[in-house]
């Protein structure tokens, strides 16, 4: 079952933590998250799953940044979230998707206990200008049934910014 917007607000600072929080970003069954001004792009055209892939930092200026199709941009949310006893899910906003902008490729699923900023895998189908601070995606919450182990030590837990892939650590 998905929580309503009112239930998300009722659970704030209990088992849902969103910082900063604004009532203006609350929806009937989700909460809009905003795009930070920092992006990462990989430096190599060919990426290797078994190796750390170098990335360079780009800052989105207030006047916007033109994204190129066929290029992966890693961004992050302004909001830091933490979730207990619920499964957090991330989706793009339909208004953003209708412009041909994807905000996650496969990683829209969070773990119970995840704490950090959400890294966004941003990809566009045609050139598009993006801006910092826009409400780019939404988080929503599912109840979980049965016993579970809390997520506390994953490689992306307690991140402090945009996270490139750390898949290479699985091979160590």
Curated annotation (Swiss-Prot):
Keyword GTP-binding recorded: no
Source domain of life: Bacteria
Gene3D superfamilies: 2.70.40.10
InterPro entries: dCTP_deaminase (IPR011962), dUTPase-like_sf (IPR036157), dUTPase_trimeric (IPR033704)
Positions of the record's site feature: Important for bifunctional activity: 108-109
Catalytic activity: dCTP + 2 H2O = dUMP + NH4(+) + diphosphate
Pfam families cross-referenced by the UniProt entry: DCD (PF22769)
Entry annotation: catalytic residues: 121
UniProt KW Cell membrane keyword: no
Enzyme Commission identifier(s): 3.5.4.30
One Gene Ontology term of the molecular function aspect: dCTP deaminase (dUMP-forming) activity
Binding residues for dCTP: 93-98, 111, 119-121, 138, 151
Pathway(s) of this molecule: Pyrimidine metabolism; dUMP biosynthesis; dUMP from dCTP: step 1/1
GO annotation (BP), single: nucleobase-containing small molecule interconversion
Broadest EC class assigned to this enzyme: hydrolase
Function: Bifunctional enzyme that catalyzes both the deamination of dCTP to dUTP and the hydrolysis of dUTP to dUMP without releasing the toxic dUTP intermediate.
NCBIfam families, A to Z: dCTP_deam
Quaternary context: Homotrimer.
PANTHER family associated with the record: DCTP DEAMINASE (PTHR42680:SF3)
Stated family: Belongs to the dCTP deaminase family.
HAMAP family: dCTP_deaminase
Protein name per Swiss-Prot or TrEMBL: dCTP deaminase, dUMP-forming
Organism field: Hathewaya histolytica (Clostridium histolyticum)
Gene: dcd
């Amino acid at each position: 079952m998905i929580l309503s917007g009112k239930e998300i607000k009722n659970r704030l600072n209990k088992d849902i933590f969103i910082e900063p929080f604004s009532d203006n970003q609350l929806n009937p069954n989700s909460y809009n998250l905003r795009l930070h001004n920092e992006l990462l792009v990989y430096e190599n055209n060919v990426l290797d799953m078994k190796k750390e892939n170098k990335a360079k930092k780009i800052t989105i200026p207030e006047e916007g940044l033109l994204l190129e199709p066929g290029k992966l941009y890693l961004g992050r949310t302004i909001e830091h979230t933490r979730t207990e006893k619920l499964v957090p899910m991330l989706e793009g906003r339909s208004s953003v998707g209708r412009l041909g902008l994807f905000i996650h490729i496969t990683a829209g699923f969070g773990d119970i206990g995840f704490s950090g900023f959400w890294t966004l895998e941003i990809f566009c189908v045609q050139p598009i200008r993006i801006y910092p601070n826009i409400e780019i995606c939404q988080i929503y919450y599912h109840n979980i049934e049965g016993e579970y182990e809390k997520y506390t030590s994953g490689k992306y837990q307690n991140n402090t910014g945009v996270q490139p892939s750390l898949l290479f650590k699985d091979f160590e």
